[in-house]
Amino acid sequence: MKIYLVGGAVRDALLGQPAGDRDWVVVGADQAQMQALGYKPVGKDFPVFLHPRSGEEYALARTERKSGRGYRGFVVDADPSVTLEEDLLRRDFTINAIARDEASGEVFDPYGGVRDLQQRVLRHVGPAFVEDPVRVLRAARFMARLAPLGFGIAPETAALMREMADSGELDSLVPERVWQELRRVLGSAQPSAFLRTLHDTGALRAILPELDALYGVPQRAEFHPEVDTGVHQEMVSDMAARLAPGDALVGFAALTHDLGKALTPPEQWPRHVMHEQRGVAPLQALCERLKVPQDYRQLAVTACREHLNVHRLPELRDRTVHELLVRCDGFRRPERIAQLALVCEADKRGRLGSEEAAYPQGPELQRVHAAALAINARDLAADGLQGPQIGEALASARIAAIAQARSLRQ
């Protein structure tokens, strides 16, 4: 029985990056031996155990053989005779197929993962890559994480991803898994690499067609020097990651704010009149299909519908600003206004040449919101107002507070 550290912990250590959870593989043991040593079985589909003291996951070395369509159709063999090399062969990428002996510290790298780390290449381990559609999503997610370190995807890996997209294999992806991977991407440093990897291999069209449809749709060059809406989508996602690191909530709203531009009739290009309204329906359909949590949906729909109003904030009347805050649910969910401001700033700065531009509308929106939020309905009730009178007086008082805050700014 031998124990090896495998996967991300080894990869990240070799990259000099902070390591997350540690995963271990056990060679030459069976389930009875593991339990006799105090390991607690937790794997439903695979022989996985928790260490009796550390609680870390230890899995028996295993092979997997494709037995059906999708990512669940596998036959697992965890016999004690399965070797370390056989276990590593089933893994997705060479950089994840590196093991380190727990006792000696010796590194085992049968598939060239160390070389690929040095050359900054994301490469699949073997032809079994095509058997699991989730690996296409994982490839794109790894690119979102590793692209800032200079990684590129191996041409042969991109070709396999394209083959999987063309074959219809990606249709078997469970929506919840797509959302799980997307949410992890939106907390990464460079979400654009996820989008670009999937788009270039044809996988984005199969997995997230609403996002893929934006590529090739032109915008007015005086407002969008990058022209292509798909490129703008990438730039906005990266800017959101820069402005709100690790905030997938803001990232999702930024990613989906312009879906309506894909619905503009080509004869109207490069203008996109009312795209902020047209984008709500495909956004809601996307959220429904992926079973996106409500807080993500609500902020995304708000940003889609209102981002142009925030851009035009200096032109809006005080009453219109109050109506905007109400539509954004800014009085019941105060945090939403700061989130919306970040999304809109990412939109404005996610354009070629505007990356370092100022966006005064963001702080201004939060300032007038704070002024209006300071008006309390309980104070009005204490003045003897009742029922609808309180609502009317509250709106009037908040509009006056907005006006005062704006006048002080001027």
UniProtKB/Swiss-Prot annotation:
The catalytic activity of this protein is classed by the Enzyme Commission as 2.7.7.72, 3.1.3.-, 3.1.4.-
Q: Which cofactor does it need?
A: Mg(2+); Ni(2+)
Q: Report keywords, A-Z.
A: ATP-binding, Hydrolase, Magnesium, Metal-binding, Multifunctional enzyme, Nickel, Nucleotide-binding, Nucleotidyltransferase, RNA repair, RNA-binding, Transferase, tRNA processing
Provide the reaction this enzyme catalyses.
a tRNA precursor + 2 CTP + ATP = a tRNA with a 3' CCA end + 3 diphosphate; a tRNA with a 3' CCA end + 2 CTP + ATP = a tRNA with a 3' CCACCA end + 3 diphosphate
Chain residues that bind Mg(2+): 21, 23
* GO BP annotations listed: RNA repair; tRNA 3'-terminal CCA addition; tRNA surveillance
Record-listed ATP binding positions: 8, 11, 91, 138, 141
Into which family does the record put it?
A: Belongs to the tRNA nucleotidyltransferase/poly(A) polymerase family. Bacterial CCA-adding enzyme type 1 subfamily.
How does this polypeptide assemble, per the annotation? Answer: Monomer. Can also form homodimers and oligomers.
Q: What is this protein called?
A: Multifunctional CCA protein
User: Per the UniProt entry, what species is this protein from, by scientific name?
Assistant: Xanthomonas campestris pv. campestris (strain ATCC 33913 / DSM 3586 / NCPPB 528 / LMG 568 / P 25)
Provide the gene name from the record.
cca
